[in-house]
Swiss-Prot record:
<keyword id="KW-0479">Metal-binding</keyword>
<dbReference type="Pfam" id="PF01077">
    <property type="entry name" value="NIR_SIR"/>
</dbReference>
<dbReference type="InterPro" id="IPR011786">
    <property type="entry name" value="CysI"/>
</dbReference>
<keyword id="KW-0004">4Fe-4S</keyword>
<comment type="pathway">
    <text>Sulfur metabolism; hydrogen sulfide biosynthesis; hydrogen sulfide from sulfite (NADPH route): step 1/1.</text>
</comment>
<keyword id="KW-0521">NADP</keyword>
<feature type="binding site">
    <location>
        <position position="482"/>
    </location>
    <ligand>
        <name>[4Fe-4S] cluster</name>
    </ligand>
</feature>
<protein>
    <recommendedName>
        <fullName>Sulfite reductase [NADPH] hemoprotein beta-component</fullName>
        <ecNumber>1.8.1.2</ecNumber>
    </recommendedName>
</protein>
<comment type="similarity">
    <text>Belongs to the nitrite and sulfite reductase 4Fe-4S domain family.</text>
</comment>
<feature type="binding site" description="axial binding residue">
    <location>
        <position position="486"/>
    </location>
    <ligand>
        <name>siroheme</name>
    </ligand>
</feature>
<keyword id="KW-0560">Oxidoreductase</keyword>
<dbReference type="GO" id="GO:0009337">
    <property type="term" value="C:sulfite reductase complex (NADPH)"/>
</dbReference>
<dbReference type="GO" id="GO:0000103">
    <property type="term" value="P:sulfate assimilation"/>
</dbReference>
<dbReference type="InterPro" id="IPR005117">
    <property type="entry name" value="NiRdtase/SiRdtase_haem-b_fer"/>
</dbReference>
<keyword id="KW-0411">Iron-sulfur</keyword>
<dbReference type="InterPro" id="IPR036136">
    <property type="entry name" value="Nit/Sulf_reduc_fer-like_dom_sf"/>
</dbReference>
<dbReference type="GO" id="GO:0004783">
    <property type="term" value="F:sulfite reductase (NADPH) activity"/>
</dbReference>
């Protein structure tokens, strides 16, 4: 097997993707970002610096609602920046919540986006405010290092670690993995925090990544059965906690999951992680590093559309990857242990923990904002000002007010009542299990609406559910504005992926447990066609389903859609 890694080579192969040259020549991710930030003539930075900026946790964007008008006025696009804050396991203190709230009000668009990877996200930050925003994030003892880019992204885990000692231990492992796999370059501290500059960066080392980092982004998540809330099979490395007699003994490991694809290119597809074995818990950080280095060394650096670890595993085979992992570890991973998932959603409302309480708040599509009739942002700040526990950002874009002492429970409940905050139980099962990415107006990749549209589409689907007697039925529905898969649509029972404004591909047949990919049902359809397609299916499901049968299972059993056994069959 040929090692295709070039991160230690003095000269790069001319066939490599241009991003490989950019990384290699970036002076360990510095580029000319400082000079771009200092340029007062434009609200943008150079395209090369915009690519490197992702490693620092920020994307350059523009307001796509204003593009045409500004073009007519011969103005440059309305540039702004998104910052994604790294929050391993989604854990934040009340003080950190208040700091994030302040940043959103001072520098962003007065909203906070809770992402599907348990991170904070700010939109609408102007170039002149970017550095101060980064500093303020750092003052809150958070950062945006490696929240984006060709590195390990925010490490996920079950968001309610105070339910038991096991959950707390899981969160600690998520933090250890995240910190261990951070880039070691000093560039972030130099550019954003006025840190002491490295006089000769040629002396700098990236002991894990090398100077070209990974071929593409890399994602790790930890699930605690029976909850698959992190969608463990969507991760490059999935870790499934194995608990015996209330003690965490280790993890089952899956490799090569991923959601993204490109419309029209069948060589790209979503894929489920493959279960390869069991490891003791004390070995988990080393195992994650060794798997990541296999992708570093053998991942495709010539074609970024096929550069994710899922394609490496598919190309080399999971048996070969497992044997190579064993070789690098110097010991063999064991056979996987038994486990079972029940769902991939959140447990909403109050949940009693060990000497404390946790309240999971339903936040539609993760957007924390105040509206005329729902002062969510104000309410959460009031809670943060009195809360003595933690906040936990959920993989389903909800928020856990965690570790609430019995003495504080009544006080927090009073704020919940005052602002009419919801645990989602007044909503349909469909809305409670919905997710959408940001899409328009800020995401440069969006082909169609998502976050701004899904709630109103659900309202219309709810009329069909009412007609079918299914309003309380738990059904997962997800929407993205492009096929990159940020809301993990390929795992949903019903999914919509944007093709053009107002047009979507419709997918059916994912598993309620997050264990099966869905498949395309109809292509390039509008809202009327969506509703016309769903009505007979929901009516039939209502009348013909088996006891306890979920919608995704029904459409496969009924022959509406073929079952997908492997991502390589996704388009067939």
């Amino acid at each position: 097997m040929v090692n295709t890694n070039n991160h230690i080579s003095e000269e790069l192969d001319k066939n490599l993707d241009e991003m490989e040259f950019l990384k290699a020549n970036s002076d360990f991710l510095r580029g000319t970002i400082e000079q771009s930030l200092a340029n007062p003539i434009t609200g943008s930075i150079t395209q090369d610096d915009a690519k490197l900026l992702k490693f620092h946790g920020s994307y350059m964007q523009d307001d796509r609602d204003l593009r045409d008008e500004r073009r007519k006025q011969k103005l440059e696009p309305a540039y702004s920046f998104m910052i994604r804050v790294r929050v391993p396991g989604g854990k934040a203190t009340p003080e950190q919540w208040i700091a994030m709230d302040d940043i959103s009000n001072q520098y962003a668009n007065h909203t906070i986006k809770l992402t599907t990877r348990q991170a904070f996200q700010f939109h609408g930050i102007l170039k002149r405010n970017l550095k101060q925003s980064m500093k303020n994030i750092n003052h809150a003892v958070l950062d945006s290092i490696a929240a984006c880019g060709d590195v390990n992204r925010n490490t996920m885990c079950n968001p309610n670690p105070y339910q038991s000692q096991v959950h707390k231990e899981i969160n600690d492992y998520a933090t250890r993995i995240s910190n261990h796999l951070l880039p070691r370059t000093n560039a972030y501290h130099e550019i954003w925090l006025d840190g002491e500059k490295v006089l000769d960066s040629s002396e700098e080392k990236e002991p894990i990544y090398g100077n070209t980092y990974l071929p593409r982004k890399f994602k790790i998540g930890i699930a605690v059965p029976p909850s698959n809330d992190i969608d463990v099979y969507s991760q490059d490395i999935g870790l499934i906690a194995i608990v015996e007699q209330d003690e965490l003994i280790g993890f089952n490991v899956t490799i090569g999951g991923g959601m993204g694809m490109t419309h029209g290119i069948t060589e790209t597809y979503p894929q489920l992680g493959r279960l390869i074995g069991f490891i003791p818990k004390e070995k988990v950080v080393d195992v994650c590093e060794k798997i990541l280095t296999i992708q570093r060394d053998y991942g495709n650096r010539e074609n970024r559309k096929n550069a994710r670890f899922k394609y490496t595993v598919d190309r080399l085979g999971e048996t070969w990857v497992t044997e190579e992992l064993n070789r690098r570890l110097g010991w063999e991973i064991k056979a996987p242990r038994d486990f079972e998932f029940e769902h991939n959603g959140d447990r909403l409302g109050w949940i009693e923990g060990i000497n404390n309480w946790n309240f999971t708040l339903f936040i539609q599509n993760g957007r924390v904002k105040d509206t005329e009739d729902y002062l969510l942002k104000t309410a959460l700040r009031e809670i943060a000002e009195i809360h003595t526990g933690d906040f936990r950002l959920s993989p389903n874009q909800n928020l856990v007010i965690a570790n609430v002492s019995p003495e504080k429970k009544e006080e927090i409940q009073a704020i919940i009542d005052k602002y009419k905050l919801t645990d989602g139980k007044n909503y349909t099962g469909l809305r409670r299990n919905s997710m959408a990415c940001v899409a328009f107006p800020t995401c440069g990749l969006a082909m169609a609406e998502s976050e701004r549209y899904l709630p109103s589409l659900i309202t219309k689907i709810e009329d069909l559910l009412d007609e079918s007697g299914l309003k309380e039925e738990e059904i997962t529905i997800r929407m993205t504005g492009c096929p990159n898969g940020c809301a993990r649509p390929a795992l949903a029972e019903i999914a919509f992926i944007g093709k053009a404004p107002g047009k979507y591909n419709m997918y059916l047949g994912g598993s309620f447990k997050g264990e099966r990919l869905n498949k395309i049902y109809k292509e390039n359809i509008d809202e009327n066609e969506i509703l016309e397609s769903l009505r007979p299916l929901l009516l039939r499901y209502s009348k013909e389903r088996l006891d306890g049968e979920h919608f995704g299972d029904f459409v496969i059993r009924d022959g509406v859609i073929a079952k997908v056994h492997d991502g390589r069959d996704f388009h067939s």
